[in-house]
């Protein structure tokens, strides 16, 4: 009966309680950590940074016009550690873009309307029109990070999310979109330094919350979750780009270079 069907579904989809470290979290086929192999010593001096920044932003301005003319949509997804430099990188990108041709979509906890839909719905509705750029400051990958670790979704939900997100991105690519996903990576010591700097600067105190400090206590869990996420969702058509972010100047230039290179390659291919 209909009632029995509902009861059976309810039993299968019980929301789990926030999970604890039990020795099983993050057990997967990874032989070594993706993040721990990243060289965070990479740096850029201010003079080189300013020169590259000017060159890349001028290129990006022209490329933005070209992708608009050719109706190519672009999705730029930013994830990373708290205080990892997402906002700074996005700011240097958008300064080169025509305001009429892009949107920046900050992602926070879903509201009541969003919770009433499939978790990807709120992201699908913000995907770019042809020829436009959509930038996401945090993304659908929260499903396999914060929602997984804090118990905001069931085990079945986050496990199947890898395939669902790959499929969504492939659909965008099939439509002609360029999809690039950035992980802004810093080490735990650099994060602590930036947190303290924010606390001590009245102009930046709004950027730091008690939740940010609590999340640091689960650094190792997040690291395991990110490693698995990278391996299972970095594809040829929608790759993850790990940005070495301990040096902000280096990180901003790497993001710009990655976007410029991707747009140039697509436009060359289309000619």
What label would you give each PLM region?
Residues 1-271:
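Glycine-rich phosphate-binding loop of ATP-dependent small-molecule kinases
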């Amino acid at each position: 009966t209909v009632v029995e069907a509902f009861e059976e579904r309810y039993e299968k989809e019980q929301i789990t309680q926030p999970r604890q470290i039990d020795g099983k979290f993050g057990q997967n086929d990874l032989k070594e950590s993706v993040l721990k192999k990243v060289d965070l010593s990479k740096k850029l001096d201010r003079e080189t940074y300013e020169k590259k920044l000017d060159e890349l932003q001028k290129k990006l301005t022209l490329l933005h016009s070209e992708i608009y003319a050719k109706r190519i949509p672009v999705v730029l997804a930013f994830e990373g550690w708290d205080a990892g430099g997402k906002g700074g990188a996005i700011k240097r990108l958008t300064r080169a873009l025509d305001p009429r041709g892009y949107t920046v979509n900050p992602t926070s906890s879903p509201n009541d309307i969003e919770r009433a839909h499939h978790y990807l719905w709120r992201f699908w509705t913000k995907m770019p029109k042809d020829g436009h750029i959509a930038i996401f400051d945090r993304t659908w990958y929260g499903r396999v990070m914060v929602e997984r670790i804090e118990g905001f979704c069931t085990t079945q939900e986050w496990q199947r999310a890898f395939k669902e997100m790959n499929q969504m991105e492939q659909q965008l690519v099939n439509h002609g979109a360029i999809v690039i996903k950035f992980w802004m990576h810093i080490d735990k010591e650099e994060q602590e330094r930036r947190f303290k700097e924010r606390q001590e600067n009245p102009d930046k105190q709004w950027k730091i919350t008690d939740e940010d400090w609590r999340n640091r206590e689960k650094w190792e869990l997040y690291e395991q979750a990110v490693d698995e996420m990278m391996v299972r969702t970095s594809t040829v058509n929608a790759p993850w780009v790990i940005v070495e972010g301990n040096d902000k100047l280096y990180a901003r230039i790497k993001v710009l270079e990655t976007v410029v290179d991707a747009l140039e390659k697509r436009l060359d291919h289309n000619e």
